[in-house]
């Protein structure tokens, strides 16, 4: 039996790290987007390492990952965004980005990512998302 709290798809854990991928989502990926990954890990006192990557199954005109860092707010019972950044590239099949983020201690944090891949001729880019569980930063 799992006593861990589940908030918007993410468990609140005492783990040192967590990873997520688009595999866990039933959304259609479309014809270009193959996989998306997100990751979070402890990186020292009051620091986390946040990571996101998008993989297409062939070279595409445009590929991107938007990485969001969320902190759990016990009062609202919701995740709140504290950091975000975007990395994009052209004429390739893979893009990734990772950063060390300074965070307040005593909270749970997670990473979620939006993943995009497509060609300019497409009416819309393929899009999916991934997210990690929450890890506690003491």
Role assignments for model-derived ranges:
Residues 54-58, 69-73, 102, 117-119:
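Beta-strand elements of well-folded, non-transmembrane domains
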Residues 45-47, 62, 104-112:
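Extracellular Ig-like/FN3 beta-sandwich strand-entry sites
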Residues 30-69:
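Short, surface-exposed binding/anchoring microloops in extracellular/periplasmic proteins
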Residues 93-103:
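Exposed aromatic-hydrophobic patches
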Residues 108, 112-122:
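Enriched for extracellular/lumenal, surface-exposed ectodomains of secreted and cell-surface proteins
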Residues 1-41:
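N-terminal prepro-regions of secreted/extracellular proteins
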Residues 67-68, 78-92:
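Solvent-exposed serine/threonine-rich low-complexity stretches and specific carbohydrate-binding patches
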Residues 120-138:
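Short beta-strand elements
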């Amino acid at each position: 039996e799992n006593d861990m709290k589940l908030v918007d798809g993410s468990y609140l854990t005492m783990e040192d790290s967590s990873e997520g991928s688009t595999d866990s989502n039933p959304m259609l990926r479309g014809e270009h987007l193959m996989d998306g990954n997100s990751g979070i890990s402890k990186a020292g006192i009051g620091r986390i390492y946040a990571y996101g990557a998008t993989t297409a199954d062939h070279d595409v005109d445009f590929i991107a990952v938007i990485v969001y860092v969320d902190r759990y707010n016990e009062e609202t019972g919701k995740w709140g965004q504290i950091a975000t950044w975007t990395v994009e590239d052209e004429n390739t099949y893979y893009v990734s980005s990772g950063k060390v983020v300074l965070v307040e201690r005593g909270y749970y944090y997670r990473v979620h990512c939006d993943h995009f891949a497509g060609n300019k001729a497409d009416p819309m880019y393929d899009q999916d998302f991934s997210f990690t569980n929450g890890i506690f930063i003491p």
